Structure formats: C-alpha cells, structure tokens
Amino acid sequence: ASHYQQDYIDSLTYTDEEVATYYNEHKNNFDVADYEYIYFKGTADSTKDADGNTVEPTDEENAAAKEAASANANAALEAVRNGLLMEKAAGNYDNGTYTDRPTGTYSGDAVTEWVFNEERQEGDLTLIESGDNYYVVLFHSRGRNDYNTVDVRHILFKVDTSDLDSKADDYQEKLDARKAEQKEAAEAALKKWEEGARTEDSFAELANELSADTGSNTNGGLYTEVYKGQMVTEFNDWCFDESRQPGDTGIVYNEGSYTGYHVIYFVGTDAPYWQVQVRNAMKNADYTQWNNDLVKDITATEASGMKYLV
C-alpha cells in the first residue's frame, strides 16, 4: 500500500501558475517576518512555603503584576518611539523579556496576527495586550523564502561509537582512532573520484558503493531541493556558501546526528524554497483528499471465522 500511495504522490505535478495561486491564497502559511518584541508577564510568580509546598499568588498579587506589566510596557513603547533600541528598552525592566525574530512564522497568536497583517509597514510599532500579558512589537519586514534550494550528493563515512564506553579511560583514544580512520577513508574516496572520470555519475557510483547513509546510498547519495537548516550545520554551511559552484567537492566533519565525514558533490541550485514549500503543501492536501475518497465508502465487516480465533 505504501508504494501505491507514494506513486500517487510522485505523480502530482503543478504549473507555476497553480503554485503562485496557492501561495497567494495561503501567504501566512509560507511567509516569514522579521520583527522584535518585548514580553511583559502580567501574572505573579508562585512561591514556596516553609515546607516546600507551592503557594499560588493571590488575586491581589496577580492584579499588581498586571498593573506593573502594563505600566512598564507603555514606558518601553514610548522609549522605543523616542529612538531607544528594543533590546536596551527591555533591559530596563525586570519583567521585560526581549526576543528577536528575523525569520518568524505565523502561528495565529495575537503577536503574529498583528505582524502578518497585510497593512504592516516597516517600522510599525505597537503595544499588544493578550490575556494578562503585554507585548511591545516592532515590525521590520515580511516576505517569502526566495532563496534557491540546492541539489547535492554525498558519501558518509560514519564514526561509529555505539560500542564504546564513554566513561572508559581509553575512550578518547579509541574515538580519535576511529575519527582518523574515517577521515582517511573519506580522503581516499575523494582522491579516487578525482583520479577517475570526475563526473557526477562517477561520484554517484562511489556513493552507492561506500556511503553509510542508508537514506541515500541507493540513489547515488542524492538529496534534492535541500533547504537551509535541513542538514547538519557543517553540511549546510558548505552547501550554501555563496561561492559554491556546480561540480565543487569537499569534505566536512560533524558530530551529533550522523557523526562522521561527508564527502560532498555540489550538483547545483534548484527551485526557490517558497515554491518547494507550496508544492509540498499542495501535495499533502491533494493526497489527503485522494486518500479520504478511497476509504469513504469502505465498510468494515467481521467474518464469521473471527470468533474462533483466540
């Protein structure tokens, strides 16, 4: 069934006009906004009594906290209007928490409802009351992810530490030895490619032969439409280096997820990320509708033989 479903998803294609129309009808789902805000908490904190039990604040204490939050928020708003930076304004108040959102997304709360309003202009500043809390919000810009995604191939030489005892005296020595071994293997693989045909196809053959990445070692190590932040930091930074050109190769090392050495081949740029996001959303919507249509008229019945099963 999964192959049948995937075949249907893969068959879905959309014209540029259809993608643009869907985007324009669902901008909030795809746009990102650059804004800052200061959060002023309008409720009092709970405390502990002598026995360590939690004591909730009284109505009077909460009312006082809200009054203080309102006063501080209004004062901060005025200070920012007069030219003080948001972060510095927040620092003037114990209950003011500053947040910078250079690529904020819409969530439907009071702040993002204001930020993502179509009428927003650069430099707009406001005070928002939401429940017991207050927010001073400064808007900078809004737009879609216009940068191009990238296509890359890679060969992973994984540093396997699953059988090592991190508390053992010789742990670091063994770890360093395994790192050195995998680094040497990565360098040897790149050298083999450089001494061969030096083509994308020859790199793909090596990936199928050598890569420890089970997610790509049957398709030549290929990842398409990679977006910023999708891969581990070192991999990401190499792929999105502004100087990167088709046919570039390199080796990066990362720790954590997929610890090891990545031999990378840069295939080239692909569709803008916003288009990738929109197409994926359209596919998800169409697949859901298709799947619902498949099962809506199905009625489950229990065969008589089921009663004999124990």
Predicted feature locations:
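An amphipathic alpha-helix/helix-turn recognition signal
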Residues: 64, 68-71, 181, 202
